[in-house]
Every structure is written in C-alpha cells, then in structure tokens.
C-alpha cells in the first residue's frame, strides 16, 4: 500500500490495512519515500519488528505537474498525440470528481474492465480488492480522483493521494483500452484537478 503519511488518521488506517493483509495471509507491504516512510513506521510501530527495503525496481517515475498539464517535450510526444486524438473523438468528455456519490459509477466500470481481461490471476484479484478497500475508505484515505466520461459512457477513472507536502502519488489508472487516448486524457485531467500545493 501507499499510504498518506501526513494524514491525522494514519494511526487508525494502518491497523485496518494490517488486518486486511492478515485475512488474506499476506504481509503488510508499505511503499513510499524510503527515509520518510521508515521514520513514520518507527514512530507508529515502536514496539514491532519490521523490515525496510529500498529497491529501484519498485521506484516510480516522478513528474512535475506542469508537464502533465501541457504534455510538452519530446518525452511526452506520444501521450500528447493520443490525448489530442481522444479530445477530438470525444469533445464533450468530462472529468468528474470521484467521491462517495460517484464511486458506484467507477465500481461498475471496474467490473467491466476486469471482465474484459478474462481470467483473474492473484495480482488482479489483489488489485481489485485494494481498489474496493480504497472506495470503502475514500474519505479516511483522503484520496483525490475522477471519472472520465461522456454522457452515460465511462472511459476510465484514476485516483491517488498526497504522499508528501508537495508530492501526489497516482495509485490507480483504469481506462478502456479500446478508447484511443483515454489513459493520457485521465492523466491530464487529474493534473488539472489537483490542488495547487502539489507540484
């Protein structure tokens, strides 16, 4: 899990995550900025044993929000072109906030998305369970996200949370692979929605 360390609710969230993992007979794995996360875990689990590991195979990309607002530069050329194609094909598409009242729409899309994938392996089942846990505790986890849609057609959804003062982590992006440019459109729309404190 990637958890919002600066949340005042973190002390309540971690035991719930640990319980969920025990029920699944899996260890509780936390991902984040190595030094900061280690300090927080040491404070919250003062009398517990834990192992910290830093592996570059688990590292994520870090982008300035401005890059996703504009998609400028050679590295983002492909995303920019796909985003333009999406906007041309779906000029009335909108990105609405994910919240407890719109989560049912995202859940319905998610079920279709998994059905389109065919057989569910352990990884997809764990991912689906994590997304559903996030939906159930949306406000507790202080998540921010949205649904990309046009009329009654949902093209995808995305969400994440702040993991440091000015850093926002995207936890999930799910889009219809048959809709050209849906993934870049989600990324741009989320970047536009983020509070100014995230850079």
Name each model feature, range by range.
Residues 135-136, 142-156:
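Conserved beta-hairpin
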Residues 14-25, 185-198:
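Conserved acyl-CoA
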Residues 27-33, 62, 94-98, 147:
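A structural signal for short, well-ordered beta-strand segments and their strand-loop junctions
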Residues 46-119:
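Acyltransferase donor/substrate-recognition loop-hinge adjacent to the catalytic core
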Residues 123-142:
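Active-site rim helix/loop that mediates acceptor-substrate recognition in acyltransferases
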Residues 179-183:
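Short glycine/threonine-rich catalytic loop with a Thr-x-Gly-x-Asp
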Residues 1-36, 149-178:
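Conserved donor-binding loop and adjoining core beta-sheet/short helix segment
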Residues 26-45, 56-59:
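Short, glycine/charge-rich beta-strand/loop segments that flank catalytic centers
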């Amino acid at each position: 899990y990637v958890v919002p360390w600066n949340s005042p609710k973190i002390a309540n969230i971690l035991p719930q995550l640990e319980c969920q993992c025990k029920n699944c007979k899996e260890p509780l794995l936390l991902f984040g900025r190595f030094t900061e996360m280690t300090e927080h875990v040491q404070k919250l689990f003062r009398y517990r044993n834990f192992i910290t590991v830093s592996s570059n195979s688990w590292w994520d990309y870090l982008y300035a929000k401005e890059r996703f607002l504009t998609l400028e530069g050679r590295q983002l050329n492909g995303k920019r072109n796909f985003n333009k194609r999406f906007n041309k094909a779906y000029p009335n598409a909108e990105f609405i906030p994910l919240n407890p009242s719109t989560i049912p729409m995202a859940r319905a899309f998610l079920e279709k998305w998994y059905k389109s994938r065919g057989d569910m392996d352990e990884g997809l089942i764990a991912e689906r369970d994590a997304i559903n846990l996030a939906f159930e505790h949306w406000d507790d986890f202080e998540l921010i996200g949205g649904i990309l849609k046009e009329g009654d057609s949902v093209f995808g959804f995305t969400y994440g949370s702040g993991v440091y003062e000015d850093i926002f982590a995207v936890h999930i992006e799910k889009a219809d692979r048959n809709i050209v440019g849906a993934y870049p459109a989600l990324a741009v729309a989320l970047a536009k929605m983020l509070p100014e404190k995230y850079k």
